[in-house]
Amino acid sequence: CLVGSEMCIRDRIITDSEAPYHERKVTLLNGPHTVLSPVSYLSGVDIVRDACNHPVIGKYIHKVQFDELMQTLNLPMDELQAYGESVLERFNNPFVDHQVTSIMLNSFPKYQTRDLPGVKTYLERKGELPKGLVLGLAAIITYYKGGTRADGAPIQPKDDQKIMDLLTELWATGDTRKVAEGVLAADELIWKEHGDLNKIPGLTDLVVEYLDSIQSKGMLATVESIL
């Protein structure tokens, strides 16, 4: 098939610009991985495949993938949906026990490159924040608090030592607003060219809301509240 400047050969696409397809991969493959991992782990789910098949976490992954991230890309929707389905098939691979903890190394830099652009674009296009992606950020922040899960499993974040020190200092305040504001203000350390994320309308308040909910109700109940 010929589509504009593209030529499709079965599952291959020859195009004069690889940028949209690289963005598609980063957004729809890497992006969901980054947020599903802390959400799943803090909900007691350790394997990516099990997360996809979980009655609550599976819906969360689908929401982030199809309702949020996919809406920020500029390729044909039918093509994006087909790619999204192929990603879910990959996540569901019965022969690979992909531990979510293996994905969570350096979660903040990953969120900055894979998910934050989607948060900003979604807000621009829809006039509201993508709840699933923001909850994913709150889950990362909570994961970096450390400690143990409800089942006693250890929570052992790994990242740049300066980021680890910042989160330790912020969580020591016991104030979720200070935690959220401090993380979102860490432009030089985490967010780079995106600047101080407290300037994004509504983001600080929503992160605080989710942090409070995770602390009081637990991760799984918080996920259910946005579905």
Question: Where does each model-flagged region fall?
Answer:
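Conserved phosphate/anionic-ligand binding catalytic regions in large, soluble enzymes, centered on
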Residues: 25-40
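Short, hydrophobic/aliphatic alpha-helical segments
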Residues: 11-28
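Extended hydrophobic/Leu-rich segments
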Residues: 8-9, 33, 223-226
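C-terminal amphipathic alpha-helical interaction region
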Residues: 136-227
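Short, solvent-exposed coil/turn linker segments
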Residues: 17, 47-51, 64, 210, ...
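C-terminal catalytic subdomain
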Residues: 40-164
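Single conserved hydrophobic/aromatic residue that forms the stacking wall/gate
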Residues: 1-4, 8-9
